[in-house]
């Protein structure tokens, strides 16, 4: 994936800290909300929501848990959106090299919880990246999954994302 960005009511969360396990088996990122205004009125003061992103790589799939907890004394309603994209750039392109030609790519929805990115390279090898979301997003497009969340005071919810890639043939979507 070239992009996997989390936004809260169209704003970037604030970084509290992160930790990579010594064996590189998981990455944990702690975030919180900035001040959130709606129609010029402060609706969420900074630091009311705690967001924990945990990413684990296992058997060719990247699994991510996004945990959200309301530390406020009132219910909190907000949108949490995961923006994503895949450009299938190779190592040389990532380092700034320009290619005279590229393969062809497409992205499509496979249902209410799945997105598939496809790319056929100049080597005629098909590469795919599949994304699976649980629970089902409120809205899903080929580059964004949005959940409308309502959390009571001190309530927590978890969202899960799995991303897998394959060469040749179809991607079996992760579950």
Which positions does each model-derived feature cover?
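Polysaccharide-binding surfaces and accessory modules of carbohydrate-active proteins
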Residues: 39-41, 45-149, 153, 157, ...
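Beta-strand-rich N-terminal accessory domains
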Residues: 1-43, 58, 83, 164
């Amino acid at each position: 994936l070239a992009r996997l960005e989390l936004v809260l009511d169209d704003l970037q969360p604030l970084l509290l800290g992160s930790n990579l396990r010594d064996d590189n088996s998981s990455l944990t990122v702690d975030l919180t909300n900035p001040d959130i205004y709606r129609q010029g009125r402060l609706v969420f003061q900074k630091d009311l929501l705690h967001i924990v992103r945990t990413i684990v790589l296992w058997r060719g799939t990247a699994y991510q848990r996004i945990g959200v907890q309301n530390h406020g004394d009132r219910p909190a309603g907000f949108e949490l959106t995961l923006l994503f994209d895949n450009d299938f750039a190779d190592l040389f392109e990532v380092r700034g090299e320009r290619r005279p030609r590229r393969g062809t790519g497409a992205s499509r929805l496979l249902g209410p919880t799945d997105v598939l990115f496809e790319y056929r390279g100049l080597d005629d090898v098909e590469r795919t990246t599949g994304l699976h979301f649980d629970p089902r997003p409120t809205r899903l497009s080929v580059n964004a999954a949005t959940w409308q969340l309502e959390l009571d005071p001190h309530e927590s919810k978890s969202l899960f994302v799995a991303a897998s890639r394959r060469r040749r043939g179809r991607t079996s979507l992760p579950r």
